[in-house]
Amino acid sequence: MAEKPKLHYFNARGRMESTRWLLAAAGVEFEEKFIKSAEDLDKLRNDGYLMFQQVPMVEIDGMKLVQTRAILNYIASKYNLYGKDIKERALIDMYIEGIADLGEMILLLPVCPPEEKDAKLALIKEKIKNRYFPAFEKVLKSHGQDYLVGNKLSRADIHLVELLYYVEELDSSLISSFPLLKALKTRISNLPTVKKFLQPGSPRKPPMDEKSLEEARKIFRF
């Protein structure tokens, strides 16, 4: 029996949460090896486990994969969540790059200087309402199907629904004008594998708080 994937990161969302979501949605059990100190990170580096000296790192199928996009691409390909042909894959890539752009803004919000946080949050909300959510609502409306690409579950649906949960944490009213996105969120959330991941006690991580931010500062020395 194949070994479970091993996820090396600290105990927070950060740049590993999308991998947790994708594996969970695919029904794949995984182990987490939490980095708890700067010394833990140094050991991974010194042992030659981190090609570019940084995490996330996932041990899977005899490889030690780094770089978030490479990790997600491999998992999506392995578990048939990356479209049926090159055209579908191109659409999926286009959608997830947009998702990643908005996700990066939300990811970096906790480390934003306090005096800039209100302006940054206002900018994020503006882009959600006027750029990103209308674009994805239009995709769903244009083909009238249940999923973003090919009327079949893909990584694009999973990454988008993960993002919808983050947006809901910022301001639950932001999705109210986008009924097809709301329906997609409900549909994906009710898939048995995703439903399990959304339950308390799963590997899903809570929003970044001051404690986990301080832990990150110590581990990554920033």
Curated annotation (Swiss-Prot):
GO molecular function: fatty acid binding; glutathione peroxidase activity; glutathione transferase activity; steroid Delta-isomerase activity
Activity modulation notes: The isomerase activity is inhibited by S-methylglutathione (GSMe).
Residue numbers of N-acetylalanine PTMs: 2
Record-annotated GST N-terminal domain positions: 3-83
Residue numbers carrying N6-succinyllysine: 4
N-acetylmethionine: residues carrying this PTM: 1
GO BP term, pick one: prostaglandin metabolic process
GO cellular component, one term: extracellular exosome
Residues bound to glutathione: 9, 45, 54-55, 67-68
Tissues where the protein occurs: Liver.
Recorded effect of pH on activity: Optimum pH is 8.0 for the isomerization of androst-5-ene-3,17-dione.
EC number: 2.5.1.18, 1.11.1.-, 5.3.3.-
Task of the protein: Glutathione S-transferase that catalyzes the nucleophilic attack of the sulfur atom of glutathione on the electrophilic groups of a wide range of exogenous and endogenous compounds. Involved in the formation of glutathione conjugates of both prostaglandin A2 (PGA2) and prostaglandin J2 (PGJ2). It also catalyzes the isomerization of D5-androstene-3,17-dione (AD) into D4-androstene-3,17-dione and may therefore play an important role in hormone biosynthesis.
Family: Belongs to the GST superfamily. Alpha family.
Protein name: Glutathione S-transferase A1
Natural source organism: Homo sapiens (Human)
